[in-house]
Amino acid sequence: MIPPADSLLKYDTPVLVSRNTEKRSPKARLLKVSPQQPGPSGSAPQLPKTKLPSAPCVPDPTKQAEEILNAILPPREWVEDTQLWIQQVSSTPSTRMDVVHLQEQLDLKLQQRQARETGICPVRRELYSQCFDELIREVTINCAERGLLLLRVRDEIRMTIAAYQTLYESSVAFGMRKALQAEQGKSDMERKIAELETEKRDLERQVNEQKAKCEATEKRESERRQVEEKKHNEEIQFLKRTNQQLKAQLEGIIAPKK
């Protein structure tokens, strides 16, 4: 495991943890002699021991603060060269200069890691989380109750951010599904449009063919009508001439009888 990166949260010096995990056997525990066990035969009986008043157990404030810090900000562990190292959060109180230095380090890291000033930025969120943890550490050393209250605030913020992140991921997944569906619908629509355009071209070709046939038919009918009209006119003229001739002949026959 790679050693943890530098953090704005102040830690103590790393400590090498002993990897001797041997456990005492049950037999070893049974070999203990009870204080009430009688001695060997012939020996004088033991007198009861006088119980001395014990001093009242006063909790060590420093140790109590360290325990609270370890509960709020757990130590970080890593393995290096098959050796387990542990690094606890520092319990050293901070001064005003430490706070000023923390602000300078925050601004420097934001600039070095090119964190975005606006919008969603994981780098900016990570650095501000480290800064907030460091502030919780500094406050907890001076007042454990205030530190625990800040811990609740931090956990609430993380829970809210996690909920928003889950909602964002769900929205992105929903948007991707809708985009894929729209893309698939677009492909189907494009295919249908291509089919309709092909059908349209076929229908236009058929319309043009029918128009050509209609024009040819109209032309033939017009020519036939003209021929028929000419023929009818010639027949009418012939019949008129015949009628005039017959009329003249009839008048010639009738006129001498008078």
Curated annotation (Swiss-Prot):
Which residue windows are transmembrane per the record? none
User: Looking at the keywords, is Coiled coil present?
Assistant: yes
Outline what the protein does. Involved in sperm flagellum assembly.
Protein name stated in the entry? Axonemal dynein light intermediate polypeptide 1
State the family it belongs to. Belongs to the inner dynein arm light chain family.
Query: Which keywords belong to this entry?
Result: Cell projection, Cilium, Coiled coil, Cytoplasm, Dynein, Flagellum, Motor protein
Q: Which PANTHER family match?
A: AXONEMAL DYNEIN LIGHT INTERMEDIATE POLYPEPTIDE 1, AXONEMAL INNER ARM DYNEIN LIGHT CHAIN 28
| Biased segments, Low complexity type | 34-48
Question: Subunit structure, briefly?
Answer: Interacts with CFAP45. Interacts with DYNC1H1.
Give the location in the cell.
Cell projection, Cilium; Cell projection, Cilium, Flagellum; Dynein axonemal particle; Cytoplasm
Major place of localization?
A: other
Region of interest: Disordered: 19-60, 207-231
GO cellular component, alphabetical, reads: axoneme; ciliary base; dynein axonemal particle; dynein complex; motile cilium; sperm flagellum
Keyword Ubl conjugation on entry: no
Q: Which InterPro entries match?
A: Axonemal_dynein_light_chain
List where this protein forms a coiled coil: 176-255
Task: Give GO terms for biological process.
Answer: sperm flagellum assembly
Sample GO molecular function, one term = dynein heavy chain binding
**The organism's place on the tree of life at top rank:** Eukaryota
